[in-house]
Amino acid sequence: MNILINKRIFLLVTLVGIQLNVTAKQNSSNSNREELLPIIVNTNDDSNKLPGRSVLKQKNIEQQQADNAANLINILPGVNMAGGFRPGGQTLNINGMGDAEDVRVQLDGATKSFEKYQQGSIFIEPELLRRVTVDKGNYSPQYGNGGFAGTVKFETKAARDFLQENQKIGGFLKYGNNSNNNQKTYSTALVLQNEQKNIDLLLFGSVRNAGDYKRPDNSKILFSKNNQKTGLIKVNWQISPEHLLTLSSVYGIHKGWEPFAAKRDILPKPSSGDIMRYGADIAWKRKLVYRDQKDKNYTLKYNYLPENNPWINLSTQFSYSKTTQNDTRPEKAPPVFLGTLGNQSWITYSDLTFDINNTSTFNIKSTRHELLFGLQWLKNTRNTLMYDKSKVKKEDYNYGYFQPYYMPSGRQYTQALYLQDQITWKNIIFSTGVRYDHINNIGQKNFAPQYNDISVGQNYSQKNYNGWSYYLGLKYDVNHYLSLFTNFSRTWRAPVIDEQYETQYKQSSGPVTATSLNLEKEMINQTRVGGIITLNHLFQENDVFQFRTTYFYNRGKNEIFKTRGVNCVGNAADTNHVCPKIIGNYRNLPGYVIQGAELEAYYQSTYLFGEITYSYVKGKRDTSPRNPWGKTSTWIAEIPPRKATTALGFNIPKYNFTAGWRAEFVRRQDRSPLSGDPEAKYWSLPASRGYSLHNLFLSWSPAKIKGMNIKITVDNLFNRAYNPYLGELASGTGRNIKFSLSQKF
């Protein structure tokens, strides 16, 4: 009933808007021309010429009509979605590194972290986004303690994205439909601006309702339905020409029955006996959890940029983000879920961040300096609790209520300072930077005495880490067309709470029962070299061609990794040597090398545009992940297969029409740790076959109906069966025809 009412309201307001705008005079300003830019990474943007950076603008985002943020940026070279297609089952992999601590995710500048077992790590609604920036690698002193793979910055929409010149009040309505899972998306916005144009307000809401996805063979990915609601409030206040204050608030909820492991695909069917005993509905739900997920994000930014004072460009930011997942199994579920968060669980991850920095610009003789200095304070909190009804009568398990031993509670505090000087001399830019981090890890004792026995090493005491990171960069503009660059960084990270304080019960058959207070910092040296060629007016007036090539080499040391397999040097040769009685659940492996290359070519003109990209990554550990004392190197399982993308399209500016084709070609992946260590199956992913996917897209803004836009996107045009390697062979989705109709007022 609510959906029917929403549809009627949407159609009514759209028709009213058409009548108000059908006779409006067309705007021929540059902002209207921006609507015609191709739906690819925009090569005209100077920020996209930075080494290692990929940018998706609003038109890219809207044209894809992606269901989740990870799938949205999967088109970028070196960036891959990992996991399956169920709601909340996606993570990111950048150049072969995919752990949550390796990929830093920010929403409007707020750090977001979530590392729940077998779950995704990002829950950002694409409908809210206006821009996504991916900086590959860790080459900036503004970021420390991890993020080796890179930083993904999601930026939400703002009032200026909807208002025309001199417009004081505006609105937005959008309806979307996907054929594969019968998804319906409703988005609406109210935009306000005062007479002085120094205060604006955006209220934005989106609802996403979808059924189960279908595989290419038309079978359903069971329990992949999506019921999601998201809201955004953003205020900009230009207090004076020198002072700007921005507040953004994002809130999202998702509820529904789904498998505990959202990243997985195949769900075992209930037995015929269970169906006869409980009925089909309850029999299925005994294998599921009812998930209640909430995601919050608050950011307050202040900028002070006085006129005629190059020494001050002050920026401060205070942010808070919180993600909660409460899972409940049905009453008739069996009490055997200790390893999957019990019969009920309450999980909360939160991040509190404060950053203040200033950039001073000055000259020393013939060199120009941009000196950045900043301070940071961060607090990451993980609160975990589960209820296991099989332990309800056991005192040593706190009568069923305790923290999962593999997902401990705790806090991590980071205090940091950073400094960078960017020096420009003629056509050379040299940058050097340093960063100091002091980190405090504080564990929380488990409610269950079973996991609080100091005699077997279950110690939740505070552990401190500190150290410096170093950054160097060089960019040489050979001429107007060619730029060469190289970067180097030496950075480190402390263990996250899981790695420091995970334990096992004291009656465990093996000696690996302790927390891991003896862990050392994980170190990495990162190097990249490359070049950028930019040619303007190549074939016709106002066209642009850009070619970029990058090679990177990452050398990691003291990799923090779970202790399984060979537990001590004494039995490294698989002898019967007895190890010490207390061994931590995590240890430092000797090291690894990840290297690769990216080739990118983009062309855009008034009428034609296209792109070709290619990314290649390979990586090896010095030893087996299960035997750090071995002499045989092994492939790293999380390295993605080679990927190439291509796109070709055209614009008809007279009719505000854009259409094109995009394809993705993925090689097979058969490199596995098993080839170096046949017993390393636990750390391996199934081999995958290569595949190609073809998509079509179309965008049209009728000239006579100002503010209206129609988009059509067809994913997997040929309904090709495929199983992405990083999805652990979870099936891809079948052909999906996406349609959206939007109206700005």
UniProtKB/Swiss-Prot annotation:
Residues 1-24 form the signal peptide. PROSITE patterns: TONB_DEPENDENT_REC_2, TONB_DEPENDENT_REC_3. It comes from the Bacteria. One of its GO terms (cellular component) is cell outer membrane. InterPro entries: Plug_dom, Plug_dom_sf, TonB-dep_rcpt-like, TonB-dep_rcpt_b-brl, TonB_haem/Hb_rcpt, TonB_Hb/transfer/lactofer_rcpt, TonB_rcpt_b-brl_sf, TonB_rcpt_CS. Gene3D superfamilies: TonB-dependent receptor, beta-barrel domain, TonB-dependent receptor, plug domain. Residues 168-745 form the TBDR beta-barrel domain. It is a multi-pass membrane protein. Keywords: Cell outer membrane, Membrane, Receptor, Signal, TonB box, Transmembrane, Transmembrane beta strand, Transport. Residues 45-157 form the TBDR plug domain. Pfam families: Plug, TonB_dep_Rec_b-barrel. It is found in: Cell outer membrane. GO terms for molecular function: heme transmembrane transporter activity; siderophore uptake transmembrane transporter activity. Its main location: membrane. Belongs to the TonB-dependent receptor family. Heme receptor. This is TonB-dependent heme receptor A. It comes from Haemophilus influenzae (strain 86-028NP).
